[in-house]
């Protein structure tokens, strides 16, 4: 099968690391793969994505060549293009309309490009926003099937979701919450399918219940960009509670983002600079290597539901931590309970520093409980989130 994957920026930039295992699985399974990023900008951050570069069609979002090809395609198929434009003009507000119009020329260019090379058998977009807009336009012009993976923020945006669901073969949602939202927005049931994201799990087993030296601080990692939805502010308050009660703990914050400075100020004001480190942006391969090497005793994700409804999907960072045998503490928000249930992690209410502190104290002091939790977590990820299981199921949906 010849598959075109449309991404936001992968293999470029630091985001969309979760797409890499699925694209590589399709390639290793013998399928012909091309990747088309909307914006082919930035450095190649993730080592695993280097292998995808030779299969990437790198073009800007807009250029004279793309505009020229779009005009030629419009002249060639004026009725089809007009129908697509009418559909695009159903966008529910001006912002979304402008976003869709911005990608329209590249979608027409892509159709023309494939017609001059090899037309794919299927187009699959990651995100049901503008990536799916390109997929819908290109697939319509080429008269081939297409599908999309929907996540969380892109669903909340509601960029022509009803129209896209009606037009595509299927919508793959990464969790039940997202699937229910799209069913409500589209009125469709049969096309909406839940298939979790898959992570690449090494064959070797982690050393569950690693023994740490009591005199050393309990080492905790929080992986996540500094955004309101991640709930950093509540975790810092929880760390202060633990330190005030004599706990020996050190927190590593991995990531960047607009709220980093305010979190740094919070750490300084609470006199926690000796107990909290800012690691910056870690590459995906570096993060995985350190997880499997036992660099951290626990991974925590204190995510919240923001005032505008932003929330977590099923965080890949938690899947990978659980696969590596690292105990997890998280909040019961978004899609997290789908992953972290039935004794696989400690879940606490959102925006509750005291509950976070109590959960972290449990992980620090109850080794036997942590080992049981880590074993159950690894089984959960192996059975339900392994790319070796998810990869073939996604490809089967496309055929």
Where would I find each of the regions flagged by the language model?
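N-terminal subdomain of nucleotide-sugar transferases
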Residues: 1-64, 115-118, 144
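Conserved acidic donor-binding segment of nucleotide-sugar-dependent glycosyltransferases
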Residues: 339-353, 362-368
């Amino acid at each position: 099968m010849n598959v075109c994957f449309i991404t936001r920026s992968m293999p470029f930039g630091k985001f969309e690391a979760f797409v890499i295992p699925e694209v590589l699985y399709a390639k290793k399974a013998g399928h012909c793969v091309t990747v088309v990023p909307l914006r082919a900008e930035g450095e190649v951050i993730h080592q695993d994505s280097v292998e995808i570069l030779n299969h990437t069609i790198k073009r800007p979002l807009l250029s004279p060549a793309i505009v020229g090809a779009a005009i030629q395609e419009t002249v060639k198929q004026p009725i089809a293009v007009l129908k697509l434009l009418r559909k695009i003009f159903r966008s529910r507000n001006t912002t979304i309309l402008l976003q869709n119009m911005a990608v329209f020329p590249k979608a027409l260019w892509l159709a023309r490009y494939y017609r001059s090379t090899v037309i794919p058998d299927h187009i699959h977009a990651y995100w049901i926003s503008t990536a799916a807009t390109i997929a819908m336009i290109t697939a319509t012009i080429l008269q081939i099937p297409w599908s999309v993976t929907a996540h969380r923020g892109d669903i909340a945006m509601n960029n022509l979701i009803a129209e896209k669901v009606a037009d595509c073969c299927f919508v793959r949602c990464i969790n039940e919450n997202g699937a229910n939202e799209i069913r409500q927005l589209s009125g469709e049931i049969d096309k909406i399918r839940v298939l979790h994201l898959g992570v690449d799990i090494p064959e070797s087993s982690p050393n569950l219940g690693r023994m740490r030296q009591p005199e050393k601080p309990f080492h905790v990692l929080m992986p996540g960009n500094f955004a309101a939805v991640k709930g950093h502010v509540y975790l810092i308050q929880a760390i202060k509670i633990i330190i005030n009660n004599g706990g020996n703990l050190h927190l590593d914050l991995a990531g960047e983002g607009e709220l980093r400075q305010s979190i740094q100020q919070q750490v300084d004001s609470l006199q926690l600079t000796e107990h909290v480190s800012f690691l910056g942006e870690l590459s995906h391969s570096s993060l995985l290597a350190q997880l499997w090497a036992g660099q951290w005793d626990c991974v925590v994700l204190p995510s919240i539901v923001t005032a505008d409804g932003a929330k977590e999907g099923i965080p890949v960072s938690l899947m990978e931590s659980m696969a590596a045998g690292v105990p997890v503490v998280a909040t019961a928000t978004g899609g997290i309970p789908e992953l972290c249930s039935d004794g696989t992690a400690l879940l606490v209410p959102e925006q509750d520093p005291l509950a976070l502190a109590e959960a972290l104290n449990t992980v620090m002091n109850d080794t036997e409980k942590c080992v049981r939790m880590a074993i159950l977590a690894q089984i959960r990820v192996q059975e339900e989130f392994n790319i070796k299981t998810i990869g073939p199921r996604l490809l089967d949906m496309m055929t």
